[in-house]
Design a protein with these regions (language model features):
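Short-chain dehydrogenase/reductase
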Residues: 2-10, 55-63, 86, 90, ...
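Residues that recognize and position ribonucleotide moieties
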Residues: 24, 41, 58, 89, ...
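A conserved pocket-lining segment of Rossmann-fold NAD(P)-dependent short-chain dehydrogenase/reductase
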Residues: 41-60, 77, 84
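Mid/C-terminal beta-alpha module of Rossmann-like enzyme folds, strongest
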Residues: 66-134, 145-173
Length: 173
């Protein structure tokens, strides 16, 4: 993955492999709960602003990921496997805005920002330079497709469809 977090995750997986301890690697995509701040922003402003362009995210709920972890811990046949886990649908920020509008009961629009506009907005909000760089790098990764993969592995492991975006956002509203 080109996502800014990928090198740390890769290094962790390499250390686990080098340890010789039997393991299963769960590569969780984005958590739907990561969008709690977007709900608050949208409630206040009617806008979800980001520099992800039309990038897509196959997020899933913490419960979906936790259920998958329980399955691989409790069922035989998973040792040595690495699973790419994502939600059943890869959505864009227009879809996110519509889902947030549904859960808060008011209009919400997605405002696509350039990376520079996003950095300026984050700076105006008081974020430090390192955090701004991290957030805009995450959005660049999403814009580039780093979180768009959805192959059904998570749903197969948990034996049910993953939690739809709007249902994952509802408890956060």
């Amino acid at each position: 993955s080109d996502l800014v977090l990928a090198p740390e995750h890769k290094a962790t997986e390499e250390l686990i492999a080098a340890s010789g301890i039997p393991s299963v690697i769960l590569r969780n995509n984005w958590y739907t709960e990561n969008y709690a701040g977007d709900i608050a922003q949208a409630r206040e402003t009617g806008v979800v602003a980001a520099s992800v362009g039309d990038g897509r995210v196959a997020s899933a709920s913490r419960k979906d990921f936790a259920d998958a972890a329980a399955v691989v811990l409790l069922e035989d046949g998973h040792l040595g496997q690495a699973y790419e886990l994502g939600g059943g649908i890869a959505w864009n920020d227009d879809n996110l805005a519509a889902a947030i509008a549904e859960v808060i009961g008011g209009p919400v629009e997605y405002r696509a920002l350039t990376t520079e506009e996003h950095a300026e907005a984050l700076e105006s909000a008081g974020l430090d330079e390192r955090t701004i760089g991290f957030v805009t790098a995450l959005d660049a990764g999403i814009r580039g497709g780093a979180l768009a993969d959805t192959d059904g592995t998570l749903a197969r492991l948990i034996g049910r469809p993953t939690t739809p975006l709007v249902e994952g956002l509802r408890p956060l509203a």
